[in-house]
Amino acid sequence: MSNPEKIFYPFIKSHNKDNWAGYVSPRMGFFNMDIPDVSFGTGFLVGNRYGVMDLPHVHDGAYNFFIFTGADLDNIFDAPFEAEFFLGENGQELEQYNINKPTFVIAPPGVYHSPIYFKKVYKGFNSMIQYSGHESRRIYSDVDENGEEVERVAKSNVTPCIKDPSKLCTFCGLCFTDANETEQDAIDKMAPIHAKVVNTEKFKKYVYELKKDYHNLGDAIMNPRLSFKGREELDEAEYQFSFNIITKPCKLGDDEPVSNGQVAEFLWFSGTDVTDSWGTFDAEIEVMVGDDPDNMKPVTFSEPGVIAIPPGMWRGPITVKRADKPICFMPWYPHTKPRYKITRKMVDGKPVLVYDDETTITNPTAGDELFMQIKR
């Protein structure tokens, strides 16, 4: 079987936000480096007080996806917070969106976005930011001495440091966060942004309040859960995900191994308090994986992390052996490819692959049609 150490990835305690006043550190995150051609990386970037994150900027060749929630994921629909987010055709005309419920936001290539204004933070404000594309630089909007808009390019380890121009920028946070900042300081900092607000609602479709999903997965998972089904709910959304809060030992999925075919799968396990993601995780979990249904082996872990299933790998049940504290389990599918759920059946004494859901196949190949005929 493939190396289990390349299947489970414990979250690394990232200290790159230690200097960012108003943010929880260490930060929990995962960035795929081992599954080719799958752009996926995210983490909990958690604000623990009022503040302003970033300035209006754009990525010409990339999408940004944002998920906003409160601090307590086991109370995800009622965890309180108030934030403002901005989208615009340029950096000088911005639409303002007030967010106080779990929300998914898309910033397509070429669309200016930010700042995120942490307006009211009662315990913590969680922003999960995903980046999908081939352009890592940021382009900021400035105004020159003649009042004309000009664009300024910034990129980590390329742009000079504002505090010390002899060094390169590392986005350490020292130039745009201040431990002594007051709530009024944050309000004053937002005044120039609010002066740019227009009421065009051109980008309203990219701000989507996440819905309650009532499931039949059993009483071990809180009901309702939060889920997002990709383009079925929001055009241009590349991601599918759900927040499943597990409260007791259980088994998820069938004993029979399945494969998602050409689709990678990321299974995220963490604590439910984003201000203490490690301290609120106390569980033991086993996931069966293998290169084929005859060679399945367990991957067992007792710390927060991600199970990364490459395309073509088989997965069996997810068994929560111990859950002394609630667990946040998030399956992620970071692309728009159809998920062909494949199982193996014995037909006339021979093993064949069978699609369990033919409706996902809109343009069947000859091989697809063969498998569907076998199933029928």
What is the predicted role of each segment?
Residues 91-92, 96-119, 291-321:
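Conserved metal-binding segment of the jelly-roll/cupin
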